[in-house]
Curated annotation (Swiss-Prot):
GO terms for cellular component: cytosolic small ribosomal subunit. This is Small ribosomal subunit protein bS18. Keywords: Ribonucleoprotein, Ribosomal protein, RNA-binding, rRNA-binding. Belongs to the bacterial ribosomal protein bS18 family. Residues 1-25 are annotated as: Disordered.
Length: 97
């Protein structure tokens, strides 16, 4: 009545791997990003608008921590300094098309 199936064929969820996860051939190990401000012992300043441009997109949005790699402390300070630079007209609020 029932077919005789060995245990390897029965458990198709593991896909032949013992840990139960499929191995992704496209997976790459990424180097953990380090905070530029911690590395250089520097504090974000609104007067250095050329340096602040690296943390702002073309549309004028502040890039998040997960992309820039800044620490939480410096990201908060960076956001304040970008806003100061915008208020002083050193950085644009939005890019004009």
């Amino acid at each position: 009545m029932y077919k005789d199936i060995d245990s390897h064929q029965r458990d198709s969820r593991t896909d032949g791997h013992q840990d139960g996860f499929k191995k992704n051939p496209n997976f790459r190990f990424f180097k953990k990003k380090t905070c530029r401000f911690c590395d250089m012992d520097r504090v974000p300043d609104y007067k250095e608008f050329d340096f602040l441009k690296k943390f702002v997109t073309e549309q004028g949005k502040i890039l998040p921590r997960r992309i820039t790699g800044t620490s939480a402390k410096h990201q908060r300070r960076l956001a304040l300094e970008v806003k100061k630079a915008r208020y002083m007209a050193l950085l644009p609020f939005v890019k004009k098309y």
